[in-house]
Swiss-Prot record:
Top-level taxon in the UniProt lineage: Bacteria
BP GO annotations: translation
InterPro entries: Ribosomal_uL5 (IPR002132), Ribosomal_uL5_bac-type (IPR020930), Ribosomal_uL5_C (IPR031309), Ribosomal_uL5_CS (IPR020929), Ribosomal_uL5_dom_sf (IPR022803), Ribosomal_uL5_N (IPR031310)
Subunit structure: Part of the 50S ribosomal subunit; part of the 5S rRNA/L5/L18/L25 subcomplex. Contacts the 5S rRNA and the P site tRNA. Forms a bridge to the 30S subunit in the 70S ribosome.
Gene Ontology molecular function terms on file: rRNA binding; structural constituent of ribosome; tRNA binding
GO cellular component: ribonucleoprotein complex; ribosome
Record's function text: This is one of the proteins that bind and probably mediate the attachment of the 5S RNA into the large ribosomal subunit, where it forms part of the central protuberance. In the 70S ribosome it contacts protein S13 of the 30S subunit (bridge B1b), connecting the 2 subunits; this bridge is implicated in subunit movement. Contacts the P site tRNA; the 5S rRNA and some of its associated proteins might help stabilize positioning of ribosome-bound tRNAs.
Gene: rplE
Keywords, alphabetical: Ribonucleoprotein, Ribosomal protein, RNA-binding, rRNA-binding, tRNA-binding
Family per similarity comment: Belongs to the universal ribosomal protein uL5 family.
Protein name per the record: Large ribosomal subunit protein uL5
Pfam families the UniProt entry points to: Ribosomal_L5 (PF00281), Ribosomal_L5_C (PF00673)
Length: 180
């Protein structure tokens, strides 16, 4: 079963971007390389159970097992020791990446309260886009009754685009609702 977002990319986005930026080859057209979802769980220093719940929610959202991230160095002000588990992250590529992006754009983002589009200023200068989500409840897989605490996450969409403008047009073509 082919993903509808991947088909849209092949049939609509590639020709549109080729025409707009005058690419000589189809391989020069930017594409989404990977999506990294990161959940920093600061409370995990005192309570390891919160990290387990956050990792389970991340696994539900992404469809694959998250990697537990550890503190690189000790910070006394945060009562943090080097090597203590403080977060979870998932790197999505290929089919799962397109499924997640499709779900994010068509289902999850419209469920955000007072949503007027995602900010256009969140590009990093190399065509990659970073999006912060304040609550995990916008994803349909998360059961509202089982949530112990509202947690946010960072979603980084890494593209092969060379400039922010190319990256913006790529994501706009894939249906990302940018603010006017």
């Amino acid at each position: 079963m082919a993903n509808r977002l991947k088909e849209k990319y092949t049939n609509e986005v590639i020709p549109a971007l080729t025409e707009q930026f005058n690419y000589s080859s189809v391989m020069a057209v930017p594409k989404v390389d990977k999506i990294v979802i990161n959940m920093g769980v600061g409370e995990a220093v005192n309570n390891a159970k919160t990290l387990e719940k956050a990792a389970a929610e991340l696994a539900l959202i992404s469809g694959q097992k998250p990697l537990i991230t550890k503190a690189k160095k000790s910070i006394a002000g945060f009562r943090l020791r080097e090597g203590v588990a403080i977060g979870a992250k998932v790197t999505l590529r290929g089919e799962r990446m397109y499924e997640f992006l499709d779900k994010l754009v068509s289902v999850s983002l419209p469920r955000v309260r007072d949503f007027h589009g995602v900010p256009t200023k969140s590009f990093d200068g190399r065509g990659n886009y970073t999006l912060g989500v304040k609550e995990q409840l916008i994803f349909p897989e998360i059961n509202f009754d089982n949530v112990d605490k509202v947690r946010g996450m960072d979603i980084v969409i890494v593209t092969t685009a060379n400039t922010d403008e190319e990256g913006r047009e790529l994501l706009k073509g894939l249906g990302m609702p940018f603010a006017k």
